[in-house]
């Protein structure tokens, strides 16, 4: 499978390249930046010397379709919605890691403050939460966001089991700094984030409508969630702590069964006996989930952790590619956590 990557200079693009270079059925044939830039990848990123010496090329949709079989967009929001149009019209497979094709146009415009993709382009894409979306044979996949992936994987089993009250769902999500992207900003300067804890976009994060939209697939009565996001001074990782009230008390064994039944055939979701931590998943495509129930308050706390650049971005994109094309789901994705 010949692959082109657009958006190679960002964190997710570089992680995507790293994974695909080790994929047994993928050949990366071209690298592109969303802005004009022509230089060997190993010149910009010396860690690639002797590993990948492909030249970063200007974007040309026709040239990509001539040389590749599938294109990944690992671009900032607002880019892929325009650049993907030629591929959609040609029926050429696209996996978009940005938020450009996850939401209906009017909702995208409200939350991203950008003009949306043309309606026929947006409607061509299917939302690719790998564990709950059948993408076999699809051509256009909108890869989920990092916060959204962690939150949805934590909550969907409970919604499927009709186990929780829908008017009390609180998500406190924290991300490492790569989640803020590569473009420099005062909010991600070292002196601002080092030895600090910064809450941002309270009630305004663009993943909120994405999460609600997907949770409604499993219970249409759900209307809203309370969602907060914070930056923590780490390179990688998402920790989503999710609070909900049970409709009726459940034992730990009953709660574990809800999650085990949902994920028993899902290789990248692990249900842990203890509350998980980031060292268990950083550098991998795993999401680890743990929980604890307080019978005094009737509040269930679920903790989901993942690597925002892998399961929250590039890894899930490759997982979707595998499922789309009928490859083994785990191809290229069985790296182990470094742990320390």
Swiss-Prot record:
Q: Please provide, in alphabetical order, the Gene Ontology terms of the cellular component aspect for this entry.
A: cytoplasm
Q: What is its EC number?
A: 1.2.1.38
Q: Does the keyword RNA-binding apply?
A: no
Q: Which reaction does it catalyse?
A: N-acetyl-L-glutamate 5-semialdehyde + phosphate + NADP(+) = N-acetyl-L-glutamyl 5-phosphate + NADPH + H(+)
Indicate where this protein is primarily found.
cytoplasm
Q: Which SMART domains match?
A: Semialdhyde_dh (SM00859)
Q: Which EC class, in a word?
A: oxidoreductase
- Record key words, sorted: Amino-acid biosynthesis, Arginine biosynthesis, Cytoplasm, NADP, Oxidoreductase
Quote the catalytic residue positions.
146
Entry's Gene Ontology BP terms: L-arginine biosynthetic process
Its family remark reads: Belongs to the NAGSA dehydrogenase family. Type 1 subfamily.
Descriptive protein name? N-acetyl-gamma-glutamyl-phosphate reductase
Organism, by scientific name, is: Streptococcus sanguinis (strain SK36)
Q: What is the lineage of its organism?
A: Bacteria, Bacillati, Bacillota, Bacilli, Lactobacillales
Task: Provide the gene name from the record.
Answer: argC
